[in-house]
Amino acid sequence: AIAGVRASSASNTKIILHLDMGGQNSLYTWFFGGLLTVSPNLDFDVFGLSYYPMWHGTMEGLQYNINYLASTYGKEVCIVETAYAWTTEDGDGVGNVFISGDEEVGGYPATVEGQFAFMNDLESVILNVPNDKGLGYFYWEPEWLPVENGTYATDAGVAYKNDTYTPCNTWDNMTLFDFNGSALSSIKVLNQPAENL
C-alpha cells in the first residue's frame, strides 16, 4: 500500500501509522520500537495517535509521548482522533460512552467550557512538540447528533457482518453541537490563532 501511494501522482500525500492510547508511551515504545527494529526503513511520514483523556492517559503523558516520538524518530505527529464531552446528558436515550465518572479521569468537567479547555490544552501540547513536528488534530465526529439513523452502522452493514448491533448513537454528548444541532461556543477554539494559546 505504501509503495502505491508513493507511486501515485499525489506525491505529497503523507503516510500515517495510527495507534490508539496516545498518552501511553510504553505502548508506543513497544510497538513502534519493535516495528522499526524489524523494518528500520519503513516508509512513513507521520505518527498518528488517538487520544481520549478518559481512556488514554493524562495530557502530560500525551506530551511526553509525542515529544518522544518526534525527537526519537524525526517524524511528525498528529492526533488523528480525539473528543471530549460537553455534557453527561444523553440526547437519544440509548446511553453514551462518556458518562459522569469519566470527568474525574479525563481531567475536565463535561461542560462546554470543559470541552473548550480540553481542546485548548490539546492544541498547546501539539504546538510544543519539538522542531515544529506537531501537525494538529482531528476531532472525531463533531456533528454526530442524536437523530434517526445517526449511527456508524447501516442496517446493511450490520446484516453483512452478521452482527447483533442495534443502531444507536453513543457519542452525542461529545459533539461540537448541542442535541438540536446548534454550534456550541467551544467550537470557537478551532478559530483562534496559535499564538493566542
Residue locations for each model-derived region?
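A residue-level marker of the well-folded mature domains of exported/periplasmic proteins
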Residues: 7-16, 41, 89, 165
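Feature marks short, surface-exposed loop/turn motifs that line or immediately flank catalytic pockets
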Residues: 23, 53-55, 86, 143-146
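Aromatic-rich peripheral "rim/lid" segments of glycoside hydrolase catalytic domains that contact
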Residues: 68-71, 87-133, 138-197
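Substrate-binding/catalytic cleft of secreted carbohydrate-active enzymes
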Residues: 51-65, 91-93
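Distinct, well-ordered alpha-helical segments
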Residues: 23-40, 58-66
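Acidic (Asp/Glu)-rich catalytic clusters
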Residues: 6-10, 34-43, 66-72, 131
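Aromatic-lined carbohydrate-recognition surfaces of secreted/lumenal glycan-active proteins
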Residues: 1-29, 76-84, 135-142
